[in-house]
């Protein structure tokens, strides 16, 4: 299927090219650059690919095939636009073609924390229409959106009255069934005791029909108190219904398990050699570990081969990682009628053989390995990779004359609205990120610069602010909502280039004017920007931010 690719955010997105503050002192950003390098060393041959296939904050991948084309959707939580959609010909080279949630009217994230809102989407295709079924946590619950073109536009949500999270659609002939994580039929025996349920979905009427059936209680073996069975998917092969799901929680005990049945509604028997994917049994002190692997989706190629997309993380030490959960790809082997993504005790490889598919081309925006890019803000609006936090009620930016101009938003941490912040994912632990800014604050508290944000309570601000009547170039760390001034100097006049150099758990901050570059702070501990320290499920975004009167 041929599709049209969106060239940027819609006019409504984050205010788009609509009206924002027209004051002459509005912060203006004229350039944004990113240069990232992997911490692991890996040589990629001509018939090989590199993991992860999507670097940085791209969790909970769901993949489907339509003809010779593959489509992928991922979680985005309270970031907006959300639910990024990618396409590929070879499962290796991916190009973003849109965001399924790209209009303020689709979902309202007001009042939500960064790691709330849209969790674990599932994408499928039937009778000329693409379907995404998803959960909006702290919103209205589970919903379906549809599109004839996966690049969009996607419909407004159709809300579905069932509880739980992580729904996916299984299609059998002209019937559809939704399988998801819910509370067990019995009172929970322990924390993390969940169940997998199935119910028919009338896709023509957009409603649930019939009775719900519990397929899995607790996990593979209830006597061992398995936790957080979730992210279920069903597919059929050789007369069996296979149910795969994540088990163990999203941290280092994460895994993927599989069960099968001759009947759709069970009973399901677990694979004797579960899990079919995990890294929890490996030496935690190994070099360049990949951990927390799970939440897989299996897909069959047009050649009959099987592959799995799944999430995992690359910590820089222990369980510390700032860049979020990433998307990996591995072949699936079949043994005695059971799928295996990775044998027990094996480490996820950074390099693997390419699928037997027509050669794909790298997309215009790199997603894997070492890469960089520059945004000169020379279009009519921002590229679709930019995201804000929560759904904007009013415009917070415009793009004009080669500048990104930020308007008025709420302060970071104020959940009642969207801040004037647009960011890109930090996709490498070793990265250099720069922007050039012009801003003269008028009142105490006014500020503009670069923000590295893991959550509403854990972020760094590096830029120009006004304090006690003086314009200062300052670096602030906000950890669990508490601000700490790290360094400050009188702000230079005129344009200033702000540069963040990330090196694992450390960051260096420099600024440059026509008089050259100077360092403001070195060896700044950045572990508070990790998921372990901040909590939640997202990765760090870095980009321009402003708050001013």
Enumerate the language-model features and the residues they cover.
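Bacterial N-terminal signal peptides that target proteins for export
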Residues: 1-9
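Carbohydrate-active catalytic/glycan-binding domains of CAZyme proteins
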Residues: 24-549
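Sec/Tat signal peptide C-region and signal peptidase I cleavage site
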Residues: 19-23
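Bacterial N-terminal signal peptides
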Residues: 8-18
């Amino acid at each position: 299927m041929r599709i049209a690719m969106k060239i940027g955010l819609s006019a409504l997105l984050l205010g788009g090219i609509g009206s924002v503050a027209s004051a002459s002192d509005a912060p203006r950003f004229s350039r944004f650059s990113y240069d990232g390098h992997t911490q692991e060393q890996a040589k990629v041959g001509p018939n090989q690919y590199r993991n992860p296939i999507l670097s940085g904050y791209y969790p909970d991948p769901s993949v489907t095939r339509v003809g010779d084309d593959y489509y992928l959707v991922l979680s985005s939580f309270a970031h907006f636009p959300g639910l990024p959609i990618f396409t590929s010909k070879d499962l290796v080279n991916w190009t973003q073609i849109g965001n399924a949630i790209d209009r303020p009217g689709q979902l309202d994230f007001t009042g939500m924390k960064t790691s709330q809102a849209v969790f674990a989407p599932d994408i499928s295709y039937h009778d000329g229409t693409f379907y995404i079924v998803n959960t909006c946590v702290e919103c209205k619950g589970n919903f379906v959106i549809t599109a004839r073109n996966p690049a969009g536009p996607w419909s407004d949500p159709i809300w579905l009255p069932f509880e739980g999270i992580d729904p996916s659609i299984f299609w059998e002939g002209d019937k559809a069934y939704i399988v998801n994580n819910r509370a067990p039929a019995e009172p929970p025996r322990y924390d993390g005791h969940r169940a997998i349920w199935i119910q028919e979905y009338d896709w023509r009427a957009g409603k649930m029909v019939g009775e719900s059936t519990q397929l899995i209680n607790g996990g593979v073996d209830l006597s061992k108190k398995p936790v957080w069975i979730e992210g279920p998917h069903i597919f059929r092969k050789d007369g069996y219904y296979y149910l795969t799901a994540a088990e163990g929680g999203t941290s280092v005990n994460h895994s993927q398990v599989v069960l099968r049945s001759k009947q759709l509604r069970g009973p399901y028997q677990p694979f004797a050699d579960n899990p079919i994917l995990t890294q929890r049994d490996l030496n935690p002190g190994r070099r360049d570990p990949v951990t927390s692997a799970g939440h897989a989706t299996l897909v069959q190629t047009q050649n009959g081969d099987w592959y799995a997309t799944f999430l995992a993380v690359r910590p820089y030490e222990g369980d510390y990682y700032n860049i979020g959960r990433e998307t990996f790809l591995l072949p699936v082997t079949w043994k005695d009628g059971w799928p295996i993504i990775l044998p027990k005790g094996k480490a996820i490889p950074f390099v693997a053989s390419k699928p037997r598919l027509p050669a794909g081309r790298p997309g215009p925006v790199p997603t894997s390995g070492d890469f960089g890019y520059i945004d000169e803000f020379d279009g009519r609006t921002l590229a679709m990779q930019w995201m804000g936090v929560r759904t904007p009620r009013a415009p917070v930016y415009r793009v004009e004359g080669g500048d990104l101009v930020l308007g008025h938003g709420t302060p970071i941490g104020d959940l009642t609205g969207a801040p004037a912040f647009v960011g890109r994912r930090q996709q490498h632990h070793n990265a250099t990120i720069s922007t050039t800014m012009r801003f003269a604050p008028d009142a105490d508290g006014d500020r503009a610069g670069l923000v590295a944000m893991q959550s509403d309570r854990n972020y760094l601000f590096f830029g120009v602010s006004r304090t006690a009547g003086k314009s200062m170039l300052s670096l602030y760390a906000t950890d669990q909502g508490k601000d700490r001034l790290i360094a400050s100097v009188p702000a230079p006049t005129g344009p200033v280039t702000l540069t963040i150099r990330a090196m694992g758990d450390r960051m260096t901050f420099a600024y440059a004017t026509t008089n050259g570059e100077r360092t403001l702070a070195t060896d700044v501990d950045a572990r508070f920007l990790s998921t372990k320290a901040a909590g939640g499920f997202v990765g760090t975004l870095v980009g321009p931010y402003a708050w001013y009167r």
